[in-house]
């Protein structure tokens, strides 16, 4: 009996010590986690997100700090809201944060995540990105499409001149979607959407895909509520849009195969690479379709959204508009009415204006999320593998500690003597991201935007259509994968040529 009591006491002591050790370990780990707001059972911090997540996350960061830990349902989310913290994620530990989280939308719409933008990090992704950069996005290749950009921009200018002659307004938001869509369609498919039914259908499908990628399916974060995505039609829309896009691209690829391989557009180039087996790994036909989709997403949304915000800010800030017009119009005279891409190379104020719009209106205010592949310390905090990371570029680029007390103001002059570029070297300015996952299509987007703004501002004076704020365009945002204006930008052009 005495022996049994002794053994029981020893076992009880050992179990107690083990449980105490586990408790202390968990407590120590929790103490070393980033600050977190309180959360609700089941849904975590989802209730604290607004229709504009970049703004609500910024508000939370002002209270809990530039590195905070949220929970969307059962998923831990590390929110980064300062350049200093972003430095550790995107530079110091870039490889550990190089993966992408899996989501229902990406899996259903993006070939199971086998594309470049949303695909998981690994050898296959590195090979695919290399194919894109070396064959599609080199400076030489981007420059070779200047004639296409010029032709499509001239088409838009003709519409504006017609509106000017009749003193009528134009929906600039609509024009800014059409222009990059036509340019991208001609570069990628060899046809423009406004003149071809297949290209028009493809534009529609790309828009639907972007809208679905910008939605927030509850099942990704709270599996117990995944039935809601079925009831509200999200799952059905994913299936319908994905199949519709795949069928369209099958048709496009087949037409290119039947026409012969002349390496005239991106589809031809990719088919040539596939047939020559020259890329060092086996690319599937579906890979081609989704590389083209990546191009449409990157080539249309960034350019159209940026153009919309540039013209919004210029009309709202007539002094900036006048200064930019003076710079551009001094260039027009010796070169005729159309400004070419080589003419904008030395337009410092134009480049400063575009940079400032990227700062205050980044098309992707929340950089596409990353997934931590192994445990790591960030700013002294323990971050566990499997944590998703959201970098709030919108908050970083409005940080008064970096940009000064006028950080909320639109002020292009701050960039005139700046060495900032678009390649993510300075983590306080990351409109295209940084590190391994930086957007590879920077030059493609900038090439169209710069020459478009130069011609719009150089050839026309502008006046916004009267609205609730008089002739001042408002700054109300819509939200999706990219953040454009909620209401169309309607303005009156007045030709000065």
Swiss-Prot record:
- Does Lipid biosynthesis count among this protein's keywords? no
Q: Which residues cross the membrane?
A: 4-24
User: CDD domains this protein is in?
Assistant: CYP71-like (cd11072)
Top-level EC class: oxidoreductase
A molecular function (GO) held by this record is: monooxygenase activity
PROSITE patterns, sorted: CYTOCHROME_P450 (PS00086)
What is one GO cellular-component annotation here? membrane
Membrane topology, as annotated, equals:
Single-pass membrane protein
Keywords of this entry: Heme, Iron, Membrane, Metal-binding, Monooxygenase, Oxidoreductase, Transmembrane, Transmembrane helix
UniProt: heme binding residues: 439
- UniProt note: phenotype after gene disruption: 90% decrease of all indole-3-carbonyl nitrile (ICN) derivatives and increased susceptibility to virulent Pseudomonas syringae.
Chief site of localization: membrane
Q: Which residues form a coiled coil?
A: none
Show the InterPro entries listed in the entry.
Cyt_P450, Cyt_P450_CS, Cyt_P450_E_grp-I, Cyt_P450_sf
The secretion signal range is none
UniProt cofactor(s): heme
**Family that this chain belongs to:** Belongs to the cytochrome P450 family.
**What is its biological role?**
Converts indole-3-acetaldoxime to indole cyanohydrin. Involved in the biosynthetic pathway to 4-hydroxyindole-3-carbonyl nitrile (4-OH-ICN), a cyanogenic metabolite required for inducible pathogen defense.
Put simply, this protein is called Cytochrome P450 71A12
């Amino acid at each position: 009996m005495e022996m049994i009591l002794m053994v029981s006491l020893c076992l009880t002591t050992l179990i107690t010590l083990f449980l105490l050790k586990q408790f202390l370990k968990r407590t120590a780990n929790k103490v070393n986690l980033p600050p977190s707001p309180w959360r609700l059972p089941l849904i975590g911090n989802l209730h604290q997100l607004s229709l504009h997540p970049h703004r609500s996350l910024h508000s939370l960061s002002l209270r809990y700090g530039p590195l905070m830990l949220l929970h969307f349902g059962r998923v831990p989310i590390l929110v980064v809201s300062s350049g200093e913290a972003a430095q550790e994620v995107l530079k110091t530990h870039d490889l550990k944060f190089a993966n992408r989280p899996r989501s229902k939308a990406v899996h259903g719409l993006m070939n199971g995540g086998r594309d470049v933008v949303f695909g998981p990090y690994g050898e296959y992704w590195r090979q695919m990105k290399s194919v894109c950069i070396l064959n599609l996005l080199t400076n030489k290749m981007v420059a070779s499409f200047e004639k296409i950009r010029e032709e499509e921009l001239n088409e838009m200018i003709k519409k504006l001149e017609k509106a000017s002659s009749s003193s009528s307004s134009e929906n600039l938001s609509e024009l800014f979607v059409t222009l990059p869509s036509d340019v991208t369609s001609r570069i990628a498919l060899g046809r423009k959407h406004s003149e071809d039914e297949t290209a028009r259908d493809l534009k529609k499908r790309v828009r639907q895909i972007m809208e679905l990628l910008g939605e927030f399916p509850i099942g990704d974060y709270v599996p117990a509520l995944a039935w809601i995505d079925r009831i509200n039609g999200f799952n059905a829309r994913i299936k319908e849009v994905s199949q519709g896009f795949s069928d369209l691209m099958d048709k496009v690829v087949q037409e290119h195969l039947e026409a012969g391989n002349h390496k005239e557009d991106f589809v031809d180039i990719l088919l040539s690479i596939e047939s020559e087996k020259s890329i060092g790994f086996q690319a599937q036909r579906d890979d081609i379709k989704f590389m083209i989709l990546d191009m449409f997403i990157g080539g249309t949304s960034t350019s159209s959204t940026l153009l919309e915000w540039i013209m919004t800010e210029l009309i709202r800030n007539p002094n900036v508009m006048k200064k930019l017009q003076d710079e551009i119009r001094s260039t027009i005279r010796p070169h005729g009415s159309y400004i070419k891409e080589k003419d904008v190379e030395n337009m410092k104020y134009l480049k400063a204006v575009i940079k400032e719009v990227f700062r205050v209106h980044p098309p992707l205010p929340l950089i596409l999320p990353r997934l931590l592949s192994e445990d790591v310390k960030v700013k002294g905090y323990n971050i566990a593998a499997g944590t998703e990371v959201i970098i709030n570029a919108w908050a970083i680029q409005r940080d008064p500690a970096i940009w000064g007390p006028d950080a909320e103001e639109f002020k292009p002059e701050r960039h005139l003597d700046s060495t900032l570029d678009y390649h993510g070297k300075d983590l306080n300015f990351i409109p295209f991201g940084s590190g391994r996952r930086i957007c590879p299509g920077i030059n493609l987007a900038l090439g169209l935007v710069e020459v478009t703004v130069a011609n719009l501002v150089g050839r026309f004076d502008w006046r916004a259509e009267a609205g609730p704020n008089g002739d001042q365009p408002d700054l109300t945002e819509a939200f999706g994968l990219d953040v454009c204006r909620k209401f169309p930008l309607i303005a009156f052009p007045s030709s000065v040529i």
